[in-house]
Amino acid sequence: MARMIQCAKLGKEAEGLDFPPLPGELGKRIYENVSKEAWQGWLKQQTMLINENRLNMADPRARQYLMKQTEKYFFGEGADQASGYVPPTEG
């Protein structure tokens, strides 16, 4: 049976992650409070941030920026948006 959690991002009960996605305290906090669905949303957001900002993941400053954005996305006021991004419209 899947592990169910109260997702901090979605505000509903949902299936939890199978393991902490990141090392350290932030990874533990995400594991305990973020659903698989919300994590997938973050992976899309993270990809946009990396591409739009041309982040070099070998650069410690880029990794630090993404860690801050991860925390803001799940537990703060929301992560930065990729400049020029327009969400798709339905219809």
Curated annotation (Swiss-Prot):
GO CC entries: cytosol
Gene3D superfamilies in alphabetical order: Fe(II) trafficking protein YggX
Presence of the UniProt keyword Iron in the record: yes
SS bond partners: none
Keywords carried by this UniProt record: Iron
Family: Belongs to the Fe(2+)-trafficking protein family.
Protein name: Probable Fe(2+)-trafficking protein
